[in-house]
Regions:
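Non-catalytic interaction-recognition regions
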Residues: 3-302
């Protein structure tokens, strides 16, 4: 097909397509479609996959989330796709490169034996670390602790990964990622569970009316809650889940500051108390919506 279109030619026995543009700031080599022995390459199969996806799904956008070191490869593939008109002009082909997960030594994360860490083993190690922390600090039966460790462990992994800008390398530190303090998944879950506990103790139908703030902490929490729609829209448009993570970390901090400065359940003014309860209930809804978008959930208690 590429030869019929006059795009491909033989160079040193291989079938190639020139994809360089005058405005390129760095060299973009020709895209090799077939090797000199007729064997296909990743470029060949990726181009075939684009053809098949267009045929089956007619997508508006195709996004490749892969190692950032593959950027040149996909630059070549996308340019061949445009030249050969494999997809309509308005179909967006997008490369989203991610960095590497490194150990404390700054090198790619490995097992103690020096091999590549399997995901199942990573999950097991994280869950065990969380379980140990639960048993060391809380009076909880083993079965419940194990179940909670799975939920909290998943948050540690997903939040730890997604809270970093995708294209940047980051250090995977089990102790830091499983901490219940700081910018971590377990801290976010602990905040949600704290709100659930307050609402349960309130023991009545949750009010819906938020009152005028009577302090700086309450005002800060309310203002941060109003940012949700804008943050969500920006994170979605930019494929940037780390911005959603940064937002819920700020929101969790704002709630905890309000919690420590305010006697929520002990407030004698019923209207004020109802306003507090309505506010933290909405805060919980926002936090739970965000962690659902990030791919994890909160337990009922911690």
């Amino acid at each position: 097909m590429y030869k019929r279109q006059g795009l491909a030619y033989i160079s040193n026995g291989a079938l190639v397509v020139d994809v360089a543009k005058p405005e390129d700031t760095k060299e973009v080599p020709p895209c090799i479609i077939l090797k000199s022995d007729g064997a296909s390459l990743y470029q060949t199969t990726d181009l075939a996959t684009i053809v098949e996806r267009e045929k089956l799904f007619k997508p508006n956008r195709i996004i490749y989330v892969v190692d950032k070191r593959q950027e040149m490869h996909f630059t070549q593939v996308f340019r061949v796709s445009r030249l050969a008109e494999l997809v309509p002009e308005d179909t967006k082909l997008q490369f989203l490169g991610f960095g590497t997960m490194n150990g404390k030594d700054g090198k790619p994360f490995k097992t103690r034996q020096g091999g590549v860490m399997r995901l199942e083993h990573l999950i097991r190690d994280i869950n065990d670390a969380v379980y140990d922390k639960i048993m060391a600090s809380r009076d909880e039966d083993e079965e419940t602790a194990r179940e909670n460790a799975k939920i909290i462990g998943l948050s540690a992994i997903k939040y730890g990964d997604l809270s970093n800008q995708a294209s940047k390398d980051y250090v995977f530190d089990v102790d830091r990622f499983t901490s219940f303090e700081g910018n971590t998944g377990p801290y976010i879950l602990y905040t949600i569970v704290r709100i659930k506990s307050i609402l349960k103790k309130f023991g009545q139908e949750i009010p819906t009316a938020i009152t005028v703030p009577d302090g700086a902490a309450q005002k800060a929490l309310m203002l941060d809650m109003t940012r949700f729609s804008d943050v969500f829209a920006q994170a979605s448009a930019e494929y940037a889940p780390h911005k959603l993570c940064a937002y819920i970390y700020d929101l969790a901090n704002d709630f905890n500051r309000f919690y420590h400065e305010t006697k929520i359940l002990a407030e004698e003014d019923q209207d004020k108390k109802n306003g507090y309860i309505a506010l933290i209930s909405y805060c919980k809804d926002i936090l739970e919506t965000c962690i659902e978008l990030l791919g994890f959930s909160a337990p009922e208690k911690m």
